[in-house]
């Protein structure tokens, strides 16, 4: 026999057997892992851990949070996986106050609803019953069943419930800086003074004449003008392109706006 390395088969057999045992153990571990995962998967979907346990609502002011949760259908027991969230969002957006809704899953069992509402710019007095109803920045008016409110920071509006320019006024109030809006306690439309004439009563004690057209731009300068006047002095403050103060029984006085 030629010189060469002789392979001892008997020595190799134990190595082959050990390799086969290791492969068998690995397959067994893999099968057990797959089975365990499958059982956990089935258990998860059969248990409460796969259902909604809590719903958080953010962004609501006029809409009741409880109503949002109930209308969304996201009650206890609803699946975190199969519930049609887009349908819940569409249902909520039927409410006249709501602009948009975003739903977010927060594992393991929580849902967060982010609600964006239209802004209330004033409270409109009804000529029919004298009640006040919220006027939104899109020009729509809410009835008592469509909102909740504990305080009124926006101006009261009278004589505008049947006016064709109500939507324009709502837009102008929305454009006006909130710091100025909060100083207006009441807005009164007086048609005998003009179709677009408005009389404002402010928290500073002034009576202001202005118009619906360019209301926001005209009233933006109000704080700078009011600080130059004595609220105890009787008269009318005209807030138009060029503001001036009309003292009672005296000539008009133009007011220079300080930058």
UniProtKB/Swiss-Prot annotation:
Residues 50-118 form the POTRA domain. HAMAP family: DivIB. It is a single-pass type II membrane protein. Residues 1-27 are cytoplasmic. Keywords: Cell cycle, Cell division, Cell membrane, Membrane, Transmembrane, Transmembrane helix. The chain crosses the membrane at residues 28-45. Gene3D superfamilies: 3.40.50.10960. It comes from Bacillus selenitireducens (strain ATCC 700615 / DSM 15326 / MLS10). The gene is divIB. GO terms for biological process: FtsZ-dependent cytokinesis. This is Cell division protein DivIB. InterPro entries: Cell_div_FtsQ/DivIB_C, DivIB, FtsQ_DivIB, POTRA, POTRA_FtsQ_type. Residues 46-259 are extracellular. Belongs to the FtsQ/DivIB family. DivIB subfamily. Signal peptide: none annotated. It is found in: Cell membrane. Cell division protein that may be involved in stabilizing or promoting the assembly of the division complex. GO terms for cellular component: cell division site; plasma membrane.
